[in-house]
A protein has these predicted regions:
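Mid/C-terminal beta-alpha module of Rossmann-like enzyme folds, strongest
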Residues: 2, 15, 211, 215-251
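Alpha-helical substrate-binding/gating segment
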Residues: 182-190, 197-230
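N-terminal Rossmann NAD(P)H-binding glycine-rich loop of SDR-like oxidoreductase domains
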Residues: 3-25
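Glycine-rich "substrate-gating" loop/helix at the edge of Rossmann-like oxidoreductase active sites
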Residues: 136-141, 168-175, 195-203
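NAD(P)H-binding glycine-rich loop region in Rossmannoid oxidoreductase-like domains
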Residues: 32-96, 100
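Conserved Rossmann-fold NAD(P)-dependent oxidoreductase catalytic core, especially the SDR/UDP-sugar
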Residues: 82-140
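Conserved beta-loop-beta element that borders a ligand/cofactor-binding pocket
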Residues: 117-118, 150-173
Length: 251
């Protein structure tokens, strides 16, 4: 299958490219710089420089592909994440770029589109929830993900297969926020996401990449991509502390 991938040098994009190439797919990967293009080409993909906000450029790049995988995001670092303005480019990618990619995929006759999204369900305590039972309740910084999901639904409504992957919080080697959490844990200040009883669902980036590849053969719809054990924030912080062999000084 000829697969067009955006966000190819991101947290999930890097392992996804490797898995797609290993599975025998012919991969075109979008990069933002010549250096990034060299990285994806070293992984076995064909690298291209494309402005995702330029619909004409996107259409030209997508032509001739069987599937589009949209993993493009611009998530700010933890030190800036509290600023709403820091999410502006990410919002544009989800609102504008996702629409351009769907338009281009439909014009190209591609039969399948995979759209990255995020789990954003309301706090439901220890009750098990998923996309089929619980409506999303996104915070302002992730609300634009719903617009990207709507574009995937538009693709499906056009007689094709649109798959949305709602990922949990990524973790893995080399990810900036993972390194930040571990550094805090070494100082005895383990990360805690909100109230101590609030649950967090996570996903290792390698598993997330495997889900992207599997989505190329999945029915249309929304899928939650998370580990099988969500953790309450307090337990999450304890797990981080244990991982670095430290006790938490603050609770």
């Amino acid at each position: 299958m000829k697969v067009f991938v955006t966000g190819a040098t991101g947290a999930v994009g890097r392992p996804t490219i490797l898995l797609l190439v290993a599975a025998g797919h012919e991969v075109t990967a979008v990069a933002r710089t010549d250096e990034k293009r060299a990285q994806v080409e070293a992984a076995g993909a064909r690298g291209v420089l494309v402005d995702l906000f330029d619909p004409g450029a996107v259409a030209a790049a997508v032509a001739g592909h069987d599937a589009v995988v949209n993993l493009a995001t611009n998530i700010p670092p933890i030190t800036r994440a509290a600023r709403r303005s820091a999410w502006a480019t990410n919002d544009r990618l989800r609102r504008e770029a996702s629409a351009h990619l769907v338009d281009a995929a439909m014009a190209a006759g591609a039969g399948r589109l995979v759209q990255e999204s995020v789990v954003f369900y309301p706090d439901s305590g220890d009750r098990w929830i998923d996309a089929s039972s619980t409506a999303p309740a996104p915070t302002p910084v992730v609300a634009s993900a719903l617009e990207a999901e709507a574009q995937a639904a538009r693709f499906t409504d056009g007689g094709r297969v649109g798959v949305v992957l709602r990922f949990g919080m990524f973790y893995g080697p080399g990810l900036s926020h993972t390194e930040t959490f571990l550094r805090l844990a070494r100082w005895g200040l383990a990360y805690s996401a909100g109230e101590r009883s609030r649950y967090t669902s996570s996903i290792q980036v390698g598993d997330a990449a495997a889900a992207v590849v599997a989505a190329l053969g999945a029915p249309a719809g929304i899928y939650d991509i998370v580990d099988d054990e969500p953790l309450a924030s307090d337990a999450y912080a304890d797990a981080l502390a244990a991982a670095v062999g430290r006790k938490r000084h603050l609770r």
